[in-house]
């Protein structure tokens, strides 16, 4: 199935409105837009370099307004009643947005309301897009009754005999097994999250960076190791995880527990070298992922991914606290972005490994609610993530680099998610999964560069 013309038009309108959200939220660009003191003509000093930016902003707003009108007109004959409602809301709100923009340009203190209305238009269009994609590509694939999930394994299977290895080869294999326990693939992104939290808070010292990121790597390693221990029986049932070191008896459980405990203690020592709050948050992150997520959320509720997003959000607070010793609004909003991004990211993997998760006994969204509902929720959480990224610009001093990166990366992520609805294959799910990784990675790098360049 290929993307239809209206889906493409609606997606383009969503991106266009998001451009206005990010521009309105980014302080440097919003100040430039204020260089025009007249409306509808600019009336600014042409020698002021901010004037071209302001004129461009108004031009983009005019084009986006035409897109909103065109989307409403085309959609009125091509989509469902509830999607028409969202289009009507956007069409009604856009003139109010224009009036607010005129008042802001002529000196009225309504900039926050102007931004809020832009966010509201974006939100209703995202909901409309999710509903339209559901109606056009979805099916009634939700199970009529909860699926029969696999029961837990009661007995530890016997260890399989390992091939004989030389001393050096055995040492390398053992080191590789312990390294795999730490879930190293998670480290780069979570370190970027902590790094972004630090630079949003201020300019960290080299010592703070080293101990915070070092503590973070050790905390991730401890959490990953405990997760391997606690899920070893389930890992053996799942094709994706059946070759993990503890599941294959390559690492004994007792040794893994000792290794995880050592990493946790080292992590807390590193965080304590920064400050007490960073250490408390680091301990909370280890406990949340290892106990709350692994033992309580993941095997028992379909909302495991959503609530579990708190584990990925905590590094943002750790980074912020490492610099200031407190938790501020910038750190909280960054943490919210990560929290909202997590379902939009992980639901793609849940789609690709749906059968494996069902075999493992995990009530993931595709297993319990079906693939159609899961794809719709990816759109919802993607929209919420983008709004969070816009809010982050509003509460920080991030500039044009962040704004441009956020918009371009969002466009690619949205394209991958829309394509997922029409292609509905494992390949499309992985493409959307990688697009989500790229989105967050690029946005975090932009935060680092933009903040440090100021």
UniProtKB/Swiss-Prot annotation:
Topology with respect to the bilayer: Multi-pass membrane protein
Pathway(s) of this molecule: Porphyrin-containing compound metabolism; heme O biosynthesis; heme O from protoheme: step 1/1
Gene3D superfamilies per record: UbiA prenyltransferase
GO cellular component: plasma membrane
Superkingdom, natural source: Archaea
Region described as Unknown: spans on this chain: 1-186
Subcellular location: Cell membrane
The reaction(s) this protein catalyses: heme b + (2E,6E)-farnesyl diphosphate + H2O = Fe(II)-heme o + diphosphate
Segment forming the signal sequence: none
Region annotation (Disordered) ranges: 137-164
The entry's keywords: Cell membrane, Heme biosynthesis, Membrane, Transferase, Transmembrane, Transmembrane helix
Enzyme Commission designation: 2.5.1.141
InterPro entries: Protohaem_IX_farnesylTrfase, UbiA_prenyltransferase, UbiA_sf
CDD domains recorded: PT_UbiA_Cox10 (cd13957)
Enzyme class: transferase
One GO molecular-function entry: protoheme IX farnesyltransferase activity
Protoheme IX prenyltransferase as annotated region, ranges: 187-451
GO biological process, one term: heme O biosynthetic process
Chain ranges passing through the membrane: 9-29, 59-79, 87-107, 113-133, 186-206, 209-229, 251-271, 276-296, 300-320, 321-341, 377-397, 398-418, 433-453
Chief subcellular location: membrane
Further facts: Carbon 2 of the heme B porphyrin ring is defined according to the Fischer nomenclature.
Function, as annotated: Converts heme B (protoheme IX) to heme O by substitution of the vinyl group on carbon 2 of heme B porphyrin ring with a hydroxyethyl farnesyl side group.
HAMAP family noted in UniProt: CyoE_CtaB
Descriptive protein name: Protoheme IX farnesyltransferase 1
Organism name: Natronomonas pharaonis (strain ATCC 35678 / DSM 2160 / CIP 103997 / JCM 8858 / NBRC 14720 / NCIMB 2260 / Gabara)
Gene designation: ctaB1
């Amino acid at each position: 199935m290929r993307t239809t013309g209206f889906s493409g038009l609606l997606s383009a309108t969503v991106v266009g409105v998001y451009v206005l959200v990010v521009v309105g939220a980014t302080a440097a660009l919003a100040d430039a837009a204020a260089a025009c003191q007249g409306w509808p003509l600019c009336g600014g000093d042409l020698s002021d370099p901010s004037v071209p930016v302001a004129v461009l902003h108004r031009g983009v707003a005019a084009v986006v307004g035409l897109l909103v009108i065109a989307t409403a007109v085309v959609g009125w004959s091509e989509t469902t009643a509830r999607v028409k409602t969202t289009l009507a809301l956007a069409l009604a709100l856009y003139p109010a947005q224009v009036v607010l923009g005129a008042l802001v340009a002529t000196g009225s203190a309504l900039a926050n309301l102007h931004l809020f209305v832009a966010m509201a238009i974006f939100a209703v269009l995202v909901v409309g897009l999710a509903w339209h994609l559901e109606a056009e590509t979805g099916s009634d694939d939700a199970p009529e009754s909860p699926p029969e999930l696999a029961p837990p394994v009661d007995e530890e299977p016997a260890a399989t005999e390992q091939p004989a290895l030389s001393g050096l080869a055995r040492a390398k294999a053992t080191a590789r097994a312990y390294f795999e326990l730490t879930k190293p693939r998670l480290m780069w992104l979570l370190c970027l999250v902590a790094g972004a939290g630090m630079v949003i808070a201020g300019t960290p010292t080299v010592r703070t960076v080293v101990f915070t990121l070092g503590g973070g790597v050790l905390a991730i390693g401890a959490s990953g190791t405990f997760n391997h221990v606690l899920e070893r029986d389930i890992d053996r049932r799942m094709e994706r995880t059946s070759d993990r070191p503890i599941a294959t008896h390559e690492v004994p459980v007792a040794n893994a527990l000792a290794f995880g405990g050592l990493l946790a203690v080292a992590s807390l020592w590193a965080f304590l070298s920064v400050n007490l709050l960073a250490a408390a948050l680091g301990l909370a992150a280890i406990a949340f992922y290892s106990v709350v997520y692994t033992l309580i959320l993941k095997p028992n509720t379909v909302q495991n991914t959503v609530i579990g997003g708190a584990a990925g959000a905590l590094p943002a607070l750790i980074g912020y606290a490492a610099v200031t010793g407190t938790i501020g609004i910038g750190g909280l909003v960054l943490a919210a972005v990560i929290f909202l991004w997590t379902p939009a990211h992980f639901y793609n993997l849940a789609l690709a490994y749906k059968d494996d998760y069902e075999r493992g006994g995990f009530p993931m969204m595709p297993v319990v609610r079906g693939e159609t509902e899961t794809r719709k929720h990816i759109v919802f959480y993607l929209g919420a993530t983008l709004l969070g990224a816009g809010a982050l610009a509003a509460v920080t001093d991030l500039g044009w680099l962040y704004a441009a990166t956020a918009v371009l990366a969002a466009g690619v992520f949205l394209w991958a998610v829309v394509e997922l609805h029409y292609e509905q294959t494992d390949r499309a799910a992985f493409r959307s999964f990688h697009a989500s990784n790229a989105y967050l990675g690029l946005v975090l790098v932009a935060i680092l560069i933009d903040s440090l360049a100021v």
